[in-house]
């Protein structure tokens, strides 16, 4: 049996590798659920907690990006900069790893919600007063009541 040329063997290797990579991509696209599908599979309690803490996670991500920008602008080594404690250093092991204080975040969120409700009720009160004044001005001069 004649031996195949070297380029033919390498072509088979690249073809097989391409098939494996292509199969992996196709399986990844078809099998992996979307974010909405994952959230819909959660239990109602976990879904409610997920929705409740969504803004907190976004705030933490925003804070982390600020720290990363500050750290990248610094000339110090990465393990010596930033407010995040390293778990490898003894004196920093027990530091809080939270980037955003959850209680403070929820408290300020509730305060903002209360302020919005108060402003809405004040605006509604002003609207009622305006309507009453308009109604009073529209009364006829010949009516006594």
UniProtKB/Swiss-Prot annotation:
GO terms for cellular component: mitochondrial inner membrane. It is a single-pass membrane protein. Keywords: Chaperone, Coiled coil, Membrane, Mitochondrion, Mitochondrion inner membrane, Transmembrane, Transmembrane helix. It is found in: Mitochondrion inner membrane. One of its GO terms (biological process) is mitochondrial respiratory chain complex III assembly. Residues 107-132 form a coiled coil. This is Assembly factor CBP4.
């Amino acid at each position: 049996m004649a031996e195949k040329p070297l380029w033919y063997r390498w072509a088979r290797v690249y073809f097989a590798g391409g098939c494996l990579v292509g199969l992996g991509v196709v399986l990844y696209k078809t099998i992996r659920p979307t974010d909405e599908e994952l959230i819909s599979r959660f239990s109602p309690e976990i879904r409610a907690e997920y929705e409740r803490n969504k803004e907190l996670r976004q705030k933490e991500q925003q804070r982390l990006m600020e720290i990363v920008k500050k750290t990248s602008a610094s000339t110090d080594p990465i393990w010596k900069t930033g407010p995040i404690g390293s778990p490898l250093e003894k004196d920093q092991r027990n530091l809080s790893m939270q980037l955003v204080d959850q209680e403070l975040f929820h408290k300020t969120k509730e305060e903002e919600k209360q302020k919005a409700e108060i402003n809405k009720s004040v605006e509604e009160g002003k609207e009622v007063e305006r309507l009453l004044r308009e109604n009073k001005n529209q009364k006829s001069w010949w009516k006594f009541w």
